[in-house]
């Protein structure tokens, strides 16, 4: 798994946009910015839809007030799913929705989880990374089935 002090890896994934999606390299996207990136197993899944994404949408103004330039959401879904999910939660254009369809970024970060037993394939683990100018400043990954350290509220506490 990526460690504190390491640079975000350079890979090409998709960012959900109002038009659909565009290619993006998170390493370039995060350069020069203070970023909170929360990661999750899947759009439209219960915890992700009821708690994770809505929490970050709600706390976005407070996160910005603490100096965060960008809040990004990473999931192993295609950009069309991420776009529809973001629209449903009024997040499109507010939260940067990163669609890691082939789990390339999740694997490069070392946060991939094999959920094939649950018929979900390879996914991203639930967690949150604080990144400054492309360098990981902190990483908190959840234990399987938990939602304790990666919530927007926990993120706010960590930022002080």
Task: Identify the residue ranges that each predicted region occupies.
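Chalcogenol-based redox active-site neighborhoods
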Residues: 1-160
């Amino acid at each position: 798994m990526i460690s504190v002090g390491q640079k975000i890896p350079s890979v090409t994934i998709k960012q959900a946009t109002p038009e659909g999606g565009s290619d993006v390299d998170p390493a370039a996207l995060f350069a020069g910015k203070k970023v909170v990136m929360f990661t999750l197993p899947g759009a439209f899944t219960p915890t992700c839809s009821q708690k994770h994404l809505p929490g970050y949408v709600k706390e976005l103004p407070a996160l910005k007030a603490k100096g965060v330039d960008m809040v990004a959401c990473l999931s192993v879904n295609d950009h069309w799913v991420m776009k529809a999910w973001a629209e449903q939660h009024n997040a499109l254009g507010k939260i940067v929705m990163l669609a890691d369809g082939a789990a390339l970024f999740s694997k490069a970060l070392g946060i991939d989880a094999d959920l094939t037993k649950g018929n979900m394939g390879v996914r991203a683990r639930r967690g949150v990374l604080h990144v400054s100018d492309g360098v990981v400043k902190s990483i908190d990954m959840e234990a399987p089935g938990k939602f304790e350290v990666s919530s927007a509220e926990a993120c706010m506490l960590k930022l002080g």
